[in-house]
Amino acid sequence: MAITYLKRSPKTSSTDDTKTREIVENILKDIEKTKEEGCKELSKKFDKYEGDVIVSKEKIEEIKKNLDQKTKDDIQFSHERVRKFAEAQLKNYGQDFEVELSDGLFAGQKLIPVNTAGCYVPAGRYAHIASAVMSVTTAKVAGVKNIIVCSSPKPGVGVHPSIVYTADLCGADVIMNLGGVQAIAAMTNGLFGNAPADILVGPGNQFVAEAKRLLFGKVGIDLFAGPTEIAVIADETADPEMVAYDLVGQAEHGYNSPAWLFTKSKKIADYVLQRVPELIEDLPDLPRENSGAAWRDYGEVILCDTDEEIAKVSDDYAPEHLEVQTKNLQWYHDRLKNYGSLFIGEETTVAYGDKCSGTNHILPTKGAGTVSYTHLTLPTTSS
């Protein structure tokens, strides 16, 4: 038995952690002293935004009126799927109960929603509409009374109109023109007239993730989410073109987004090694820059001898998103243990789960899938 790296990444997801931690610690200390004014100055510095922080009800109504109907329909479709899945999770995940342990001794469990949830919605390179659906909808279904949304504003515009519409549709009580570490600090400390968040949820870049990590304890967090990850398990029956496309589709999220292929097929591996750079070269400027750096620095192709070896490698990596494109899907379904979200069958791509199949895309990264709850996306979602 042998595991061979046909392409091994020169970097890991922890390469820049020390520098990131130092930057975030300094920002958080500064905001503790400067409060709202410090947040505004950082928003001006990083986002070139100098407008109001709180999105007014009038602005929300204006966006709802002017946003194109196709975008609204797509958002509502995603919201309905995610809401239904969240309701099913709430119903089946845990129930209130009381039990008599001995004569006269009663013990029980009661699920009580937090009062305030702070939902972070990334909008640095792209407006992550789906992140608003995933975080706000789930908090609303859980019964959270006060939901605050923060997202990076654009100069002269504020939060992306589609994110404002989505957050309002899904049940946000307050929407703030604030992104980055300053947004996490503002929600944690109850700035701009809001109650302090009891929990922070939602993905973000390495600085947002580090801010959540440093503030954990003062505030609850969903998980420590780093850059998005994809791993594809493929055998000789897989379509190598589809494998290559799926790897690039996640790598383009950011310059430090790992993309991994685990396979027994040298033919599949060689095809992907040749094809991925070609696909990257055909992308528009920003996605090409992101995916090129991600594949160069974090991409890996690992050749194994057996299915068991592949499963062991996959469980060791515990990828955020894991696709299985093999002839023995059921074996992998039963064998694999560590992942954030599992996508079974070649027609079940990560994009479905990330956008609108219903399962949540706020998932563990950097190996945290070994101790986190997992989701399963079956081929029927592609129909």
Predicted features and spans:
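Short acidic loop-to-helix transition motifs that present clustered carboxylates
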Residues: 103-104, 154-158, 178-186, 329
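NAD(P)-dependent aldehyde/semialdehyde dehydrogenase
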Residues: 257-373
